[in-house]
């Protein structure tokens, strides 16, 4: 995705603590700046999702997460497995440092991270230059939207912006796997 005024507007919205909708690999997502507690709590309130569940973050690279993830806690084989699938449609639970905020990790001792190859997500992460929350654009318990037209109007009324684009070709949201144990948490 080329750098566009819509991308600039999305970044500006994130910078002021706003919540945006954007297409991901399989469904539309909601995003905000995970470093801003108020933004994350507002996003979770919009979705009716409890904070203890935690959220996925997407990023342009692990470098923007260095204060939150403890890569040294992974063995070389574990790290190789993670890096072999990025950028791509794979979410990994990574070990965290003490600086990882609870409003992002929830009641978990790991952080769900994806380095996406989806053109909109990748461009947004690059332009933003920081981690970004990525959670499905739906109310908790409802099916996620697979197109902009399917976004709940009540949800759209409560967010601050939409970055247009198409979802990728995945039939289901990205799989989630724990890098420490290899356990598949969502297939």
Swiss-Prot record:
Its EC number is 2.7.7.87. Required for the formation of a threonylcarbamoyl group on adenosine at position 37 (t(6)A37) in tRNAs that read codons beginning with adenine. Catalyzes the conversion of L-threonine, HCO(3)(-)/CO(2) and ATP to give threonylcarbamoyl-AMP (TC-AMP) as the acyladenylate intermediate, with the release of diphosphate. Keywords: ATP-binding, Cytoplasm, Nucleotide-binding, Nucleotidyltransferase, Transferase, tRNA processing. Gene3D superfamilies: DHBP synthase (3.90.870.10). It is found in: Cytoplasm. Signal peptide: none annotated. This is Threonylcarbamoyl-AMP synthase. It is an enzyme of class 2 (transferase). HAMAP family: TsaC. One of its GO terms (biological process) is regulation of translational fidelity. InterPro entries: DHBP_synth_RibB-like_a/b_dom, Sua5-like_dom, TC-AMP_synthase, TC-AMP_synthase_SUA5. Belongs to the SUA5 family. TsaC subfamily. It comes from the Bacteria. It catalyses: L-threonine + hydrogencarbonate + ATP = L-threonylcarbamoyladenylate + diphosphate + H2O. Its main location: cytoplasm. GO terms for molecular function: ATP binding; double-stranded RNA binding; L-threonylcarbamoyladenylate synthase; nucleotidyltransferase activity; tRNA binding. Coiled coil: none annotated.
């Amino acid at each position: 995705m080329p750098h566009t005024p819509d991308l600039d507007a999305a970044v500006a919205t994130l910078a002021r603590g706003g919540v945006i909708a954007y297409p991901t690999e399989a469904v539309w997502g909601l995003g905000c700046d995970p470093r801003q507690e108020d933004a994350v709590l507002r996003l979770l309130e919009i979705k009716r999702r409890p904070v203890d569940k935690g959220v996925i973050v997407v990023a342009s690279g692990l470098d923007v997460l260095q204060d939150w993830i403890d890569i040294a806690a992974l063995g070389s084989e574990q790290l190789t497995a993670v890096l072999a699938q990025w950028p791509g449609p794979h979410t990994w639970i990574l070990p965290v440092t003490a600086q990882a905020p609870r409003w992002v990790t929830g009641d978990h001792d790991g952080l769900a991270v994806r380095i996406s190859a989806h053109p909109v997500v990748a461009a947004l992460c690059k332009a933003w230059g920081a981690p970004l929350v990525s959670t499905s654009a739906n109310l908790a318990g409802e099916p996620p939207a697979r197109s902009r037209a399917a976004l709940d109007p009540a949800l759209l009324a409560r967010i601050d912006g939409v970055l247009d684009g198409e979802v990728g070709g995945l039939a289901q949201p990205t799989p989630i796997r724990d890098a420490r144990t290899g356990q598949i948490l969502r297939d």
